[in-house]
């Protein structure tokens, strides 16, 4: 369920403050954050935000088409390595039904 429009978007106060300071100075530094639930505002465009995925910080370059999305959408938390399969040389998988 989406957030109520009367509440407005959630943006971490400290993160927004750092981005606005960098905009006023014209700097482009990587900003580390643990706030995956923060919504990307137009002020973030052109900056790189390192979003924590539970293990490390994943650098995310914010573009125009990312405005309105949440930071956590661009830092996956799960690493999918594929399903376990039999060895292809010996044909270790189960026989197929006809």
From Swiss-Prot:
Residues 74-98 are annotated as: Disordered. One of its GO terms (biological process) is ribosomal small subunit assembly. Keywords: Ribonucleoprotein, Ribosomal protein, RNA-binding, rRNA-binding. One of its GO terms (cellular component) is small ribosomal subunit. One of its GO terms (molecular function) is rRNA binding. PROSITE patterns: RIBOSOMAL_S19 (PS00323). Pfam families: Ribosomal_S19. It comes from the Bacteria. Belongs to the universal ribosomal protein uS19 family. Protein S19 forms a complex with S13 that binds strongly to the 16S ribosomal RNA. This is Small ribosomal subunit protein uS19. It comes from Chlorobium chlorochromatii (strain CaD3). The gene is rpsS.
């Amino acid at each position: 369920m989406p957030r109520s429009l009367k509440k407005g978007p959630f943006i971490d106060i400290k993160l927004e403050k750092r981005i606005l300071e960098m905009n006023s100075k014209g700097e482009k530094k990587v900003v580390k954050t643990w706030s995956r639930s923060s919504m990307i505002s137009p002020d973030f465009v052109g900056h790189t935000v390192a979003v924590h995925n539970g293990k490390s910080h994943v650098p995310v370059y914010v573009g125009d088409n990312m405005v309105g999305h949440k930071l956590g959408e661009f830092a996956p938390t799960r690493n999918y390595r594929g399903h376990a399969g039999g060895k292809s040389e010996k044909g270790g998988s189960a026989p197929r039904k006809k």
